[in-house]
Amino acid sequence: MMEFEKDLRVTETNIPGLLVFDLSVHGDNRGWFKENWQRAKMTGLGLPDFGPVQNNISFNAKRGVTRGIHAEPWDKFISVATGEIFGAWVDLRPGDSFGRVYTTRLDPSKAIFVPRGVGNSFQALEDGTAYTYLVNAHWSLEQKKTYTFVNLADPELNVQWPIPLDECELSDADLHHPMLKDAKPMAPRRTMVTGCNGQLGRAIRAYVEEHGLQGFEFNDIDTFDFSNPKQYEQFDWSLYGTIINAGAYTAVDKAETPEGHVAAWKANAQGPALLARVAAEHNITLVHVSSDYVFDGAREVHDESEPFSPLGVYGQTKAAGDIAVGNCPRHYILRSSWVIGDGRNFVRTMKTLSDRVADPQDALDQVTVVDDQIGRLTFTDDMASAIFHLLGYRDTPEPVEPAAYGTYDMTGSGESASWCGIARMVFDQANGNGDKVKPVTTAEYYANTTGPVSPRPAYSTLNLGKIENTGYRPANWQESLNAYTATL
């Protein structure tokens, strides 16, 4: 018997993320009315803001129609428009709760939220039962290939169907689904990494391989130019749960040239805007890496609340990209400075110069390095670890609760230094010749440069308090520098 005038409330179940809602149904002499799904009220009670895009109705003409058990690659919000069902849900996601069962009855005064990967089944208990549900992805043949099934009659599940299954109407397909012991857990949504051949992209791939993470796809501009709108058509984005954007245009001086100006805006602003749009449309978490160049460097230490004030084209394009990504509901922006990773970089160059100065056969006897820009190094392996920490990975294949979405400053920890000071550390470790590094101002260093030069922030130190409050401890950049230099 349907209960009227209940308060809207939610009840957790023994399956993580599976939520039962009591709905408020208002009846009178004409019939009844209910708010079947109310985003603001229900998200306030704990319903994920799952972004439904399609509404389906299953009409069951006769009592005893039974359907399932199907785990589908989307979230569902299920209710009944008329009649009553007995529902059984089975967790078919990898993890400790795999195979866990929950059952209940639904009439128009109840609803249930079924997270992606939880198997769904029901039995109509009345003639003319209308079962209705919202989903947050459009059905496609590609999606159907990812379904996972379990047999309704599996004795291991031991579902106590009110009407014996041999008296029910089932499809031939549902009769022949595998038992739980033979069922394949539903794989999580995929993760795409863009810019995979850059310094950070290679560090992310190394982290994935080292930790045995599954479901990752790596693309660079030759396979997916994320700044080209037409190239988005090659992917079924409903299959992806996370995008990690490690791609960017980083030639800060060349960005001041006419051709560099166009390239920087394309890669650093248009590309992230396109990624943000597709991420918002498909409930994808977007990870994006920012730069200290979005600030003018007037403050000695910058935090996440500081307004943008870029000095040059590169910084302007990075700020524009940050603004676009910030409009994506599920986003992480990690702001870095002075990035060092696999490939050409400042430290590798200083090691080479130190070796030359130490070589009596080489005419080079000293080098000049800028001493009026202050900051901290960011090593790409540390940045990769921070990204996965925010996403909920804790050195295990299975993620835990991710951090709150938003912007996080992320560099190495420790005292700040100038480029000249860092160069001296490398020279001393390599050949004990740090005294051969001579300080100059930025203006002096670029005085004889013929091409365009991008303005640099004088202070690039970022406040690490916010990311440290998530439990992540950035590595001390000087210790990382010593370890890295020792490998060169």
Q: Language-model features: where?
A:
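Non-catalytic, conserved peripheral segments adjacent to functional cores
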Residues: 2-106, 126-130, 135-189
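N-terminal Rossmann NAD(P)H-binding glycine-rich loop of SDR-like oxidoreductase domains
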Residues: 190-211
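Adenosine-cofactor binding site in Rossmann-like domains, unifying the SAM/SAH pocket
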Residues: 215-234
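Mid/C-terminal beta-alpha module of Rossmann-like enzyme folds, strongest
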Residues: 386, 393-451, 483
